Amino acid sequence: WLVTIPITLFFAYIQPVIIEPLFNDFSSIENKELEQKILALAEEADIPANRVYEVKMADQTNAMNAYVSGIGKNTQIVLWDTTLANLSEEEILFVMAHEMGHYAHKDIYKDLTIDFVISFFVYWFIAKLMKNIIQKNGQVLNIKRIEAIHSLPLYLLISSILFFAISPLSTAISRHQEIKADNYAIELVEEEGAGISTFQALAKSNLNEANPPLIVKWFRY
C-alpha cells in the first residue's frame, strides 16, 4: 500500500506531459480568440497554464470531453476536437469553467487522499479476511498461506466484491464534487443557460442516461 503512494503521485505529475501525448495527438488550439477567453478564466481560477491544447479524437469517438490535468507546473488545459466541433463558444467556456472548478476546489488532491485512505482500510480488511478463510478452509481451497500464488483468485474475488460494495460512497463523493464544480462554473461565466444546453449535448453525445434508476445512480453516477 505504501509503495502505491509515490507511484500514484509520480504518474499524476507526468501524465499530462509524457503519458497522454503518447496515445493521442496534442496540438495548440487553432481558435486563438477562444484560447484567450479560456486562459482568462484560468487566471481567475489561479491555474498556472499559458496554452490550451486540442486533442484529435474525432476519428475514435463521437463523445466530447474537456479537462484540466496535472499537478503544479505540469497543469494543462485540454479540449477534444469533438467538443470544439459540437458545442457553442458559450458552452465550451462553461465546460472549461466546470473543469476549472475541480482544480480550484483541489479535487485531484482530495480524490488521491480519499483513495489512499479507503484503499488502506480495504486492503487491511482483505488481508484479515483472507487469513481467516485460509486458516479455516485452506485445505479445501488448496491454499496453504496468504502469500501463495494460489491465493490470487481468492484475493481478486474478495477485492472485487468489496470495491463494488463501497462504490456508492465513491459516487456520492463524486456527485458532491460535480455539483460544486457546476456552481463554480455558473458563478464564473454567469450563464446558467449555457450549462443546461451543455449537459444536454454531453449526455446525447456520450450516450448517458438522463434519468437512471436510483440504484443505478448510487452505483454508477
What are these regions (language model features)?
Residues 1-146, 156, 160-221:
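Polar-ligand-bearing catalytic/cofactor-coordination segments
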